[in-house]
Amino acid sequence: MNYLVMISLALLLMIGVESVRDGYIVYPHNCVYHCIPSCDGLCKENGATSGSCGYIIKVGIACWCKDLPENVPIYDRSYKCYR
């Protein structure tokens, strides 16, 4: 039984798992995309399953994306937007 678990874990690590996450999509400088024209289209173009408008305190209305790939940057509250 333990061998089966170890083999399954090894296969999972070898195959690799593409993880996804939800978040506010941003430009490379941690500046959010605002909800005009459409968040759903923007999010889907970047590999998400869907998108909608959300609100961030001190930032305003921004695009919230569901199931974004790891390579797409999302909003990080610890960094400010700079252009």
Swiss-Prot record:
Disulfide bonds join 31-81, 35-53, 39-63, 43-65. Residues 1-19 form the signal peptide. Residues 21-82 form the LCN-type CS-alpha/beta domain. Pfam families: Toxin_3 (PF00537). One of its GO terms (molecular function) is toxin activity. The C-terminal basic residue is removed by a carboxypeptidase. Expressed by the venom gland. GO terms for biological process: defense response. Has the structural arrangement of an alpha-helix connected to antiparallel beta-sheets by disulfide bonds (CS-alpha/beta). Belongs to the long (4 C-C) scorpion toxin superfamily. Sodium channel inhibitor family. Alpha subfamily. Alpha toxins bind voltage-independently at site-3 of sodium channels (Nav) and inhibit the inactivation of the activated channels, thereby blocking neuronal transmission. This is Toxin Aam1. It comes from Androctonus amoreuxi (African fattail scorpion).
